[in-house]
Every structure is written in structure tokens, then in C-alpha cells.
Regions:
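Membrane-anchoring hydrophobic helices of lipid-metabolizing enzymes
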Residues: 1-102, 106-107, 137-141
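Active-site metal-coordination segments of metallo-dependent hydrolases
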Residues: 32, 132-133, 193-197
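Non-catalytic C-terminal accessory region of glycerolipid acyltransferases
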Residues: 26, 48-55, 92-94, 117-120, ...
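Short, flexible loop segments at the rims of nucleotide/cofactor-binding pockets, characterized by
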Residues: 76-83, 147-152, 189-191
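Generic structural signal for isolated residues within well-ordered alpha-helices
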Residues: 2, 37, 114, 141-142, ...
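Alpha-helical structural context
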Residues: 6, 41, 118, 145-146, ...
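Catalytic core of membrane glycerolipid acyltransferases/transacylases, capturing the structured
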Residues: 95-155, 178-188
Length: 262
């Protein structure tokens, strides 16, 4: 990966696109899962359109994975040219406890890197350790490369992340997950009752934090990372309603680029 970091971005993206097209053909079980999800979420689209989205998704996945070569190993000057952080960036300033709502778009690590490069604030996140210790160490090192970043194991509880929030820090949270019925509630997602982790409203309430969506989009020149205004009157006293609202707004973000979401 260090070698790839030295190559022009167009070369890295082109190589990754080739791998993505090959995997789309060979990884049939995964392809069927993607196509099934697209059918559930976008039944109004034709089979041809959904298949094209599925193929694009495989390509974006491979491109985002190889992009981590330069995200985590290229000089800062290279990243400054390829990462465009814009929008309501003032939401990341000050000392108000802040939760970044970071949906699972392929550019999630690019977004985190862009924020880490731009703020002196404590910046925490939650991760699930990988079985491969070397891969886990490489990913963790990449994610803490810039800024005052700390990664906390989700199996160690929420105390460290809450402490960071209450101290005026930022929590990068990816709550659009399904960890099973014991940790989830069922709320609508594209018209289907989906098991959803209610961590966003709970962290916001416990940390007295505002919620700021940050949406990354892969572009030919790198990543466009848009900071949205903080949600108003969030959270409420109703965790289920707050989680349903999160899913509803997530649908809006996904609809702008469905092939970049996973």
C-alpha cells in the first residue's frame, strides 16, 4: 500500500476499477446480496439500472480500499489537494460536544481524515477489532494519523467516548448498523422495519451533544466531504422516533449516491 501511495490517483483508481469489475463477476454470493438490497430499497428502478448500481458499488468499494494507501501514507500536501472539506464547517469549531453522524459511505475514512486534519479538538470514534492483528494495527494507525484522534473498542463500553464528548470533543459515530435484536430497535428504512442501533440519540442525550451529519462523496480528484448543519431539536425524549428520523434522513443522503453506500 505504501507503493500505491506514490502513484497518480488516476492509476490507483483505474487499477481498483479493474479489480471491482472482476469481483463483480466472481463474487457471486456478495453480488446477490447487493442486488437484493437494491431491489428492496429501489423497487421502482429497472433490473438493468439496479445491476449497474451494483457494479458501480463493487468498483467504488475497491477504489475506496486502495485509496487508503494515500490517505494513510501519502504526504499531507497530497491529502490537502484531494480532500475538500466544505459546508457548515463552523459546526466543528468551538467546544460544544459534537457527534458526527457518519453513514457507511465508502468515503467514511476519507471524511474522518479530513476532519482530523482540520480540527485541534479531541476526536474519538468506536471500532470493532479485526481478527487479523496486523491488518487491525494498520487500519488503527491510519485512522489516528492526523489530529488528536483516539479509537475505542466497542466492547469496552461507552465511558471513554462519553468522557470525550463531555470534555468538548467530537465523536465520529457510524450508527447505521445492525448488531442483532438485543442491541437494536425496529424502525422504518425504505419502507421496511429494519433492526437499527439507537446509539445516535442515546449518545446525543447522554453527552448533551449536537448531531452534525458529514457526508463524503468519492470524486475523480479525491473526496468531497460536506458538513451539514446540526440537526435542530434532536434528540427528543423518544428514542424510537429519533432513530426513525435518523433513518429517514439517511435515506435522503443515500438517494443522492446509492452506489457509494454499503
Amino acid at each position: 500500500m505504501r507503493f500505491l501511495a506514490k502513484l497518480p490517483l488516476s492509476w490507483v483508481r483505474g487499477f481498483a476499477a479493474l479489480i471491482g469489475r472482476i469481483l463483480f463477476v466472481l463474487a457471486a454470493p456478495r453480488r446477490r446480496v447487493v442486488e437484493k438490497n437494491l431491489l428492496l430499497c429501489f423497487p421502482e428502478r429497472t433490473a438493468k439500472e439496479r445491476r449497474a448500481l451494483a457494479r458501480e458499488s463493487f468498483i467504488y468499494f475497491c477504489q475506496a480500499w486502495l485509496d487508503r494507501s494515500w490517505l494513510w501514507h501519502a504526504p499531507r500536501s497530497v491529502l490537502e489537494k484531494r480532500l475538500k472539506l466544505h459546508g457548515a464547517v463552523q459546526e466543528l469549531e468551538g467546544t460544544t460536544p459534537t457527534i458526527i453522524f457518519g453513514p457507511h459511505f465508502y468515503g467514511l475514512d476519507a471524511a474522518a481524515t479530513a476532519i482530523g486534519m482540520s480540527t485541534p479538538r479531541l476526536f474519538t470514534s468506536i471500532y470493532t477489532p479485526l481478527p487479523d492483528k496486523r491488518l487491525d494495527a494498520w487500519i488503527t494507525a491510519g485512522r489516528v494519523r492526523f489530529g488528536d484522534v483516539k479509537m475505542f473498542n466497542r466492547f469496552d463500553g461507552i465511558k471513554n467516548n462519553l468522557s470525550g464528548l463531555r470534555a468538548g470533543g467530537i465523536l465520529y459515530l457510524l450508527p447505521d448498523m445492525n448488531f442483532g435484536p438485543q442491541e437494536s430497535i425496529f424502525v422504518p428504512f425504505y419502507g421496511i422495519q429494519a433492526a437499527t442501533v439507537p446509539s445516535l440519540p442515546r449518545f446525543a442525550r447522554l453527552g448533551k451533544a449536537k448531531v452534525v451529519p458529514v457526508i463524503p462523496r468519492m470524486t475523480p480528484w479525491g473526496y468531497d466531504v460536506e458538513v451539514h448543519p446540526a440537526w435542530q431539536n434532536y434528540p427528543s425524549d423518544d428514542v424510537e422516533a429519533d432513530t426513525a428520523l435518523m433513518n429517514a434522513r439517511l435515506e435522503g443522503y443515500i438517494n443522492t449516491m446509492p452506489s457509494q453506500y454499503y
